[in-house]
């Protein structure tokens, strides 16, 4: 089981990164919250991972801390929720926000997430309510040194047409339809916004 990677980021293309550890490049898919907590390509990063082995592939999913990874693991226990949908959910809201939705039976909010229909939202509430009853939001002992490496210290650059395209591509990869993704980006775009801000604002506007 690969549970943690520390190395140099070679590439960043939302929602995936390529990180080199001891000469080996690992492709890792992350929720947007974790993706944009990473530094720029060429810098060192630490990623907590969940390793999935399938008949046709071996996949790594990455997270900023153990808390977010723990929520991902709870999500994929739900019938009908796979890793891709779990990433989309954690991209649309934080783990703590999701817990509040479950506790409040907020089906109308959950169905606004990509790939989550009414039946899936209801199933999430039914299957997870008891399991998340004592969810504290604790960081599950993520070492402080790891957090420091994971913190994003880069300066945001001004948004361009490429930033818009990248943001739309990221939303589509999360499960949003291209037309809806483009519309959401156009609605929130303000001159000077970078790709990260575009994605964050568009996701928030669709909830």
From Swiss-Prot:
Homotetramer. Forms an RuvA(8)-RuvB(12)-Holliday junction (HJ) complex. HJ DNA is sandwiched between 2 RuvA tetramers; dsDNA enters through RuvA and exits via RuvB. An RuvB hexamer assembles on each DNA strand where it exits the tetramer. Each RuvB hexamer is contacted by two RuvA subunits (via domain III) on 2 adjacent RuvB subunits; this complex drives branch migration. In the full resolvosome a probable DNA-RuvA(4)-RuvB(12)-RuvC(2) complex forms which resolves the HJ. Residues 159-207 are annotated as: Domain III. Belongs to the RuvA family. Residues 1-64 are annotated as: Domain I. This is Holliday junction branch migration complex subunit RuvA. Pfam families: HHH_5 (PF14520), RuvA_C (PF07499), RuvA_N (PF01330). GO terms for cellular component: cytoplasm; Holliday junction helicase complex; Holliday junction resolvase complex. Keywords: Cytoplasm, DNA damage, DNA recombination, DNA repair, DNA-binding. HAMAP family: DNA_HJ_migration_RuvA. It comes from the Bacteria. The RuvA-RuvB-RuvC complex processes Holliday junction (HJ) DNA during genetic recombination and DNA repair, while the RuvA-RuvB complex plays an important role in the rescue of blocked DNA replication forks via replication fork reversal (RFR). RuvA specifically binds to HJ cruciform DNA, conferring on it an open structure. The RuvB hexamer acts as an ATP-dependent pump, pulling dsDNA into and through the RuvAB complex. HJ branch migration allows RuvC to scan DNA until it finds its consensus sequence, where it cleaves and resolves the cruciform DNA. GO terms for biological process: DNA recombination; DNA repair. Residues 65-143 are annotated as: Domain II.
């Amino acid at each position: 089981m690969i549970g943690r990677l520390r190395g140099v980021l070679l590439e960043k293309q939302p929602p995936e990164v390529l990180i080199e550890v001891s000469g080996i490049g690992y492709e890792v898919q992350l929720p947007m919250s974790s993706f944009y907590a990473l530094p720029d390509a060429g810098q060192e990063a630490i990623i907590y991972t969940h390793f999935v082995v399938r008949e046709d592939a071996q996949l790594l999913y990455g997270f900023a801390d153990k808390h977010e990874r723990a929520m991902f693991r709870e999500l994929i226990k739900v019938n009908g929720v796979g890793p891709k949908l779990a990433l989309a959910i954690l991209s649309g809201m934080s783990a703590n926000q999701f817990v509040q939705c479950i506790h409040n039976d907020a089906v109308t909010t959950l169905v606004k997430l990509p790939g989550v229909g009414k039946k899936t939202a209801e199933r999430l509430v039914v299957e997870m309510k008891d399991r998340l009853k004592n969810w504290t939001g604790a960081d599950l002992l993520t070492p402080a040194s790891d957090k420091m490496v994971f913190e994003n210290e880069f300066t945001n650059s001004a948004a361009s047409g490429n930033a818009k395209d990248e943001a739309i591509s990221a939303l589509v990869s999360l499960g949003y339809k291209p037309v809806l993704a483009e519309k959401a980006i156009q609605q929130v775009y303000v001159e000077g916004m970078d790709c990260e801000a575009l994605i964050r604002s568009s996701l928030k506007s669709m909830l």
